């Protein structure tokens, strides 16, 4: 089985639950969105290359043996290739047993029931797209599955985006019975001050929600 891949590399994890830790990255080709401020827009124009899953597993195992903490599957949108990603995770688990794996997704692709490893093993960082992304796709990611570790994330560039996050929390998380971490990434100091006030309010109002101000640290450090 093959995955269509744009690149693989080792770098520091810039965001999410494993921020600051070394990771082996698999960047999948293809995306179903075209976000206005996408940071890989030029790269995503490329078709990618077909790579055997067993070769990716071999690279990942080598990286783990050389000090990498976890595996990151990103894009693009990796869930456009669910069968291949599921196969990659399954083969990797067979080789090394437990190792942390995180998948970055935009939350607009339904998980296929037959992809068992995708439901039971990886952590997810779900990038919830605000109005400033200028994309319209329904959010369909299953937030209520109690055996999945899901973290939410939104890049906030303006006040409209803050209102969007507030509305999303009310719509999807108001009656939640599971705890969630929601990373809110303000892009300017002005917006950051406003976001901080809302983070305080959200965390007070929703006991199972842990809203956090967040940033893409790899960009600050000048790393890939």
Regions found by a protein language model. Name each.
Residues 2-37:
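N-terminal pre-triad scaffold of radical SAM enzymes
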Residues 3-7, 34-122:
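Conserved Radical SAM active-site core
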Residues 13, 57-61, 170:
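Generic structural signal for well-ordered alpha-helical scaffold segments
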Residues 17-19, 23, 33, 77-79, ...:
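Short, flexible micro-motifs
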Residues 25, 70-72, 125, 153:
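Short aromatic/hydrophobic contact patches that present stacked aromatics
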Residues 31-35, 63-66, 141-144, 176-177:
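Short amphipathic alpha-helical segments, especially helix-boundary/capping motifs
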Residues 80-224:
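Conserved AdoMet/S-adenosylmethionine-binding subsite of the radical SAM
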